[in-house]
Design a protein with these regions (language model features):
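Active-site nucleophile loop of the alpha/beta-hydrolase fold
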Residues: 144-154
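Short substrate-entry loop that stabilizes the transition state in hydrolases
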Residues: 41-45, 50-89, 153
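Alpha/beta-hydrolase active-site loop
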Residues: 92-112
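C-terminal catalytic histidine-bearing segment of alpha/beta-hydrolase fold enzymes
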Residues: 214, 221-262
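Mobile cap/lid helix-loop segments that gate and shape the active-site cleft of serine hydrolases
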Residues: 153-189, 195
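Alpha/beta-hydrolase fold nucleophile elbow
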Residues: 114-125
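N-terminal cap/lid segment of alpha/beta-hydrolase-fold proteins
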Residues: 2-41
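Short beta-strand/loop motif that positions the catalytic acidic residue
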Residues: 193, 199-201, 205
Length: 262
């Protein structure tokens, strides 16, 4: 089954990057995402499945951010998640929409320019809830959790502004839908992760507090998963573009090191 259905070029001024909006098959649905392919002189077969944060229009995939990763030699694919930007279905915040992440990985595997053993997954914020199961269900080269949610019970308690969204997408509050909160929390998958993991988190993050990173690190360590933890001091959920790019270079360097070890 070929997952690619359509590929529409998006305007980008530099010849070094080809940016397109892709329509692809995810189960029975047609969903969308952004693909950035760096020039042949920059790339070496490595790829990143970038799993965005937010919900619907909040936290939508940004071209400039994807170019940062692509400039470091990676073909990047970032699903928008179902129900967004003309994609079919409904975004469930880590429910059936997980298939959009799995199929995004498969789409990269089907790309002849990609080495199937060198596909890395990055989950930012809510993307952490998408990235951990992807690392369990697909042969990822590595997993990066950046400012990522690891505990859905915590997310419900910490973010009163997200209560309504979580009650809708998780079919109720934790006391009613305990099982759903459990199975969607990356913490409960730590023992199933096979790939090396790097965790990057800002100490002053108020959207996803740093305790998510500390608990995730502990669960992975106890489970015997190779894991590194980097805390970014005096920064919040979003940082300056310059600092963001410095950390992006760092995490991509780590990804390349994992490939050498494979």
């Amino acid at each position: 089954l070929n997952r690619l259905v359509d590929d529409q070029t998006l305007g980008y001024p530099s010849q070094l990057f080809h940016v397109s909006e892709v329509t692809y098959r995810s189960g029975e649905l047609l969903v969308k995402g952004m693909r950035v392919v760096p020039d042949g002189s920059l790339r070496n077969g490595s790829a990143i499945l970038y799993l965005r944060g937010g919900y619907r229009q909040v936290g939508m995939v940004r071209m400039a951010r994807m170019i940062q990763y692509a400039s470091l030699g990676f073909i990047v694919f970032a699903p928008y998640y179902r129900g967004n930007a003309g994609g079919e279905g409904v975004d469930e915040f880590g429910g059936a929409d997980l298939e959009d992440a799995y199929s995004g990985f498969d789409l990269l595997q089907e790309d002849r320019r990609v080495d199937p053993d060198r596909i890395h997954v990055v989950g930012f914020s809510r993307g952490g809830v998408m990235a951990a199961p992807t690392a369990v269900n697909r042969p990822v080269a590595s997993l990066t959790s950046w400012g990522a949610v690891s505990n859905c019970f915590r997310m419900y308690d910490e973010r009163k502004d997200m209560g309504r969204l979580l009650r809708r997408t998780f079919q109720g509050p934790p006391e009613q839908a305990r099982r759903t909160y459990q199975i969607r929390s990356p913490l409960n998958m730590a023992h199933l992760i096979q790939a090396p993991v790097q965790i990057v988190h800002a100490t002053e993050d108020v959207h996803v507090p740093v305790v998510h990173a500390l608990e995730w690190h502990r669960a992975l360590t106890v489970s015997g998963v190779p894991v590194t933890l980097s805390l970014i001091r005096n920064q919040g959920h979003r940082m300056t573009p310059k600092l963001q790019y410095e950390w992006t270079k760092r995490i991509c360097e780590w990804m390349k090191q994992q490939e050498k070890g494979s």
